[in-house]
A protein has these predicted regions:
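Short aromatic/hydrophobic contact patches that present stacked aromatics
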Residues: 66, 143, 227-229, 267-269
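Flexible, surface-exposed loop/linker segments and immediately adjacent secondary-structure boundaries
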Residues: 22-159, 163-177, 182-221
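Cleavable N-terminal signal peptides
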Residues: 9, 19-20
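Bacterial N-terminal signal peptides that target proteins for export
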Residues: 1-7
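Short glycine-/aliphatic-rich beta-strand segments at the starts of folded cytosolic domains
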Residues: 220-230
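Short beta-strand micro-motifs in enzyme catalytic cores
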Residues: 99, 151, 226, 264-268
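Extracytoplasmic
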Residues: 223, 234-298
Length: 298
């Protein structure tokens, strides 16, 4: 593998598709593997990455993603999920941030949360589509999931309007109400009506866990100071091979030349980890890919 391939790897390591001064959406945390696709290019999702309209996010097994929108709302994704940022725009209205967004969750579980401060200091107009169902959000906390046989939207707090294709919208204004839209072959099943019910606290706890980043899983966080050195080698080709494998599997690896010219080596790193414990947990997760146990560092 030639030097220009190492240069290309370094560009990917430091670049993030390009950045804007005030990101409308940013990756706060990611429990890899996860990817983002933009303009036909698919690459690993990294903590701190700024997102744009038309980006498509996907997660793998045992993966989680936490996004923060410009006005303070959070979007969480569970494992084996797919979400497109169909519309994403912001503007300042006096001292308030006004966010307009359309999110399309075509697979997996998600959660949308607006905290008290964000409600007071901003406004939002967000539509979330869950395959066959659209929920209109103005400031709330909800959980949803697109499964093979049904789409679910659960109101945790606030108020939302939920609508299945070509049907009248249904207003949910009671905490813990949820809406189920049966599907058949990935399409609305008109032979079965939508259902409304109230979720139990126990079930809600189970649902919420599907989108939460848990401690000890090796998740990266924006601003994390720790790193995992997943591999190190004096052989540039060997290091690049590990780098390529990690990125193909959805891990945001970077490659760095270290040492003097006489004793040059190449480290493959995954950064933005919040603690030594998370770096060590990630080392265990990626060992089957790298073939060796990495080491934590700062």
């Amino acid at each position: 593998m030639q030097i220009r391939n190492l240069v290309a790897a370094l560009v990917l390591s430091f670049g993030a598709f390009g950045a804007c001064a005030a990101p409308t959406a940013v990756v706060e945390g990611v429990q890899m593997p996860a990817w983002v696709e933009r303009g036909g290019l698919k690459r690993p999702l990294a903590a701190g990455m700024e997102l744009e309209a038309a980006d498509r996010i996907s997660t793998g097994a045992n993966s989680r993603v936490l996004l923060r929108l410009a006005e303070g709302s959070q979007v969480k994704l569970g494992e084996n999920a797919q979400m497109s940022l169909d519309r994403l725009a912001q503007r300042q209205d006096g001292r308030q941030t006004f966010l307009q967004a359309a999110l399309d969750v075509s697979r997996g579980a998600f959660r949308f949360t607006t905290d008290v401060k964000a409600k007071l200091l901003s406004r939002r107009e967000v539509d979330i589509r869950v395959t066959t169902v659209t929920a209109g959000i103005r400031g709330t906390d909800l959980w949803g999931k697109s499964a093979d046989d049904r789409d679910i939207v659960c109101l945790i707090e606030g108020r939302i309007a939920v609508q299945r294709e070509a049907e009248q919208p249904v207003n949910l204004d009671q905490a813990l109400q949820f809406y189920i839209a049966p599907k058949a072959g990935g399409r609305p099943d008109a032979s079965r009506p939508v259902q409304l019910a109230t979720v139990t606290p126990e079930q809600l706890t189970q649902w919420a866990a599907e989108t939460e980043i848990a401690a000890g899983q090796g998740a990266a966080r924006r601003g994390g100071k720790w790193k995992l050195v997943a591999a190190a080698s004096p052989d540039q080709n060997a290091a690049l091979a590990v780098y390529d494998r990690l990125r193909a599997e959805g891990y945001a690896a970077s490659i760095f030349p270290v040492g003097s010219a006489e004793k040059r080596a190449y480290e493959v790193r995954i950064g933005s980890l919040p603690s030594k414990a998370e770096a060590e947990a990630l080392a265990i997760r990626v060992e089957p890919i790298t073939g060796s146990r990495g080491r934590a560092g700062t």
